[in-house]
UniProtKB/Swiss-Prot annotation:
Residues 1-21 form the signal peptide. It comes from Lymantria dispar. Belongs to the chorion protein family. This is Chorion class A protein Ld2/Ld41. GO terms for biological process: chorion-containing eggshell formation.
């Protein structure tokens, strides 16, 4: 009788654990109000986005180039390769100076509906001369 009672208690413990783990699993707590969701680190009001550190109003927000915590430095060198299908719908606007040294090449079919226009001027200078980079206003 004692072993039967012990077995019954073990079965009940497994059932209770199974029932409560469905409602309060690690994923449910983290996704709703834990570290990665809700008001946690990756939330709209946490460190990841919204009003947090990486937010538009946070440290990496709307700052001039070279002033924000995560602002683009303006200096870069290397190859960029994109493979696969790139369906693009809508409007893409790039404002400001975009210095490009090298060549831009499309291989294969590029289907576009609508109009594509590039306006502005292209300078071959890059870096602090044009006000980009870390501490740009102090490097003149």
């Amino acid at each position: 009788m004692n072993s039967f009672a012990f077995l019954l208690v073990c079965i009940q413990a497994c059932l209770v654990q199974s029932v409560f783990s469905q409602c309060t699993s690690r994923a449910a707590v983290a996704a709703d109000r834990g570290i990665i969701g809700g008001y946690g680190l990756g939330a709209p009001y946490g460190l990841g986005c919204g009003y947090g550190l990486e937010a538009p109003y946070g440290w990496a927000g709307y700052a001039d180039y070279g002033y924000g915590l995560d602002a683009y430095g303006g200096i870069g060198e290397g190859n960029v390769a994109v493979a696969g299908e790139l369906p693009v719908a809508g409007t893409t606007a790039v404002a400001g100076q975009v210095p490009i040294m090298g060549a831009v090449k499309f291989g294969g079919d590029v289907c576009a509906a609508g109009s594509v226009s590039i306006a502005g001027k292209c300078d071959c200078g890059c870096g602090e001369v044009y006000g980009y980079g870390l501490g740009a206003p102090y490097l003149y």
